[in-house]
Swiss-Prot record:
Modified residues (Phosphoserine): S37, S121
Family note: Belongs to the UPF0461 family.
The protein's name in its UniProt record: UPF0461 protein C5orf24 homolog
Signal peptide: none
Basic residues compositional bias, start-end: 80-92
Entry keyword Phosphoprotein: yes
Species, as recorded: Pongo abelii
One Pfam match: DUF5568
């Protein structure tokens, strides 16, 4: 809510004084005239000279090739440095071959796929699980005794 403010300043405009609104309109028009006259004053003195441009593409292309070639070499060197002395649970140490016998993180020999049937270390027939009753070491189902060979001549 607006309250009327009393002031002795004649430039103060309150609500309902049309003379103040007219003064504002005149001031705004005067300001625009000043700007337009200044623009016309400067527009005559400014001269636009055509600039001569020289292309330096061959220099830039060779520079780009050398820097990009260096960055690729640096990236390769960083990868090699990161893999030094690497061993542990994540694969075989760097510098060893697949034939060295390191297994993948899933437990099957390297060079084999899941489709080959290696679900765990191959101590039981491929494609079987622990729930099938196979122990890891013997290679035969538990519960079956070794049958002695009987000769038919003993009977």
């Amino acid at each position: 809510m607006m309250h009327p403010v009393a002031s002795s300043n004649p430039a103060f405009c309150g609500p309902g004084k049309p003379s103040c609104l007219n003064e504002d309109a005149m001031r705004a028009a005067d300001q625009f005239d000043i700007y337009s006259s200044q623009q016309s004053k400067y527009s005559h003195t400014v001269n636009h000279k055509p600039m001569v441009c020289q292309r330096q593409d061959p220099l830039n292309e060779t520079h780009l090739q050398t820097t990009s070639g260096r960055s690729i070499e640096i990236k390769d060197e960083l990868k090699k440095k990161k893999n030094l002395n690497r061993s542990g649970k994540r694969g075989r140490p760097s510098g060893t071959t697949k034939s060295a016998g390191y297994r993948t993180s899933t437990g099957r020999p390297l060079g084999t796929t899941k489709a080959a049937g290696f679900k765990t270390s191959p101590g039981r027939p491929l494609g079987t699980t622990k729930a099938a009753g196979y122990k890891v070491s013997p290679g035969r189902p538990p519960g079956k005794k070794q049958q002695a060979f009987r000769c038919s001549s003993d009977a």
